[in-house]
């Protein structure tokens, strides 16, 4: 079945109430951007939203490999997963506004891959080699945390291929034009054919900007 979610900036005092409203409207997910100079902290607001809801998925929309260490992200996600009763999702991209507003560049594809692999291993309770230091979430019992789905937001072909390799979910960020969606789907399908991964094991979606107005031109 298709799912529909809303991307909403985390806003202290409002996120939990609005999360309850969109759940009552029938939406399936709430995603809060992790962009520290433009909005509040997403994880605190998502945990408050978890307490105010019962069904919807809760996710960053998106986080990035630049502004938080992978262990910090994993710890925040594990906490949200426990607080929400298993409704957390790990949605990540290369980093745009979050990096630009502190004078840093987006993560390269290889950096994104390493970061996602580290977060995945932390969440599974495994040790992660951090430049010779054996690191893990010592407060988390290995295997005790329900799986947190990995969702990679993709714009270019390299990131789409990476997402097909690593993620549970792929979210295209290529606009709403049908020809752009068809192109992105083509790249994903080619990678699935190359690796032999079962298409049924991967959920595919898209970020779409939606503006309601009586005038199409405006």
PLM regions: where:
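Active-site mouth loops of central-metabolism enzymes
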Residues: 2-13, 63-70, 144-155, 210-213
């Amino acid at each position: 079945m298709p799912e529909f979610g809303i991307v909403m900036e985390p806003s202290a005092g409002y996120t939990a109430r609005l999360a309850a409203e969109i759940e009552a409207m029938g939406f399936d997910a709430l995603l809060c951007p992790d962009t520290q100079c433009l909005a509040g902290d997403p994880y605190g607001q998502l945990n408050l939203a978890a307490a105010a809801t019962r069904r919807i998925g809760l996710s960053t929309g998106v986080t990035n490999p630049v502004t938080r260490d992978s262990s910090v992200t994993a710890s925040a996600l594990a906490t949200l997963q426990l607080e929400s009763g298993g409704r957390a999702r790990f949605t990540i991209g290369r980093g745009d506004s979050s990096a630009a507003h502190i004078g840093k560049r987006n993560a390269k594809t290889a950096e994104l891959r390493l970061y996602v692999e580290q977060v995945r291993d932390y969440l599974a309770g495994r040790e992660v080699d951090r430049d010779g230091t054996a690191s893990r979430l010592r407060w988390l019992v290995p295997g005790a945390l329900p799986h947190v789905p990995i969702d990679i937001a993709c714009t270019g072909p390299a990131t789409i291929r990476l997402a097909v390799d690593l993620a549970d979910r792929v979210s295209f960020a290529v606009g709403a034009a049908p020809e752009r969606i068809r192109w992105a789907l083509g790249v994903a399908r080619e990678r699935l054919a190359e690796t032999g991964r079962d298409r049924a094991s991967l959920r595919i979606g898209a970020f779409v900007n939606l503006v309601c107005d009586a005038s199409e031109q405006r």
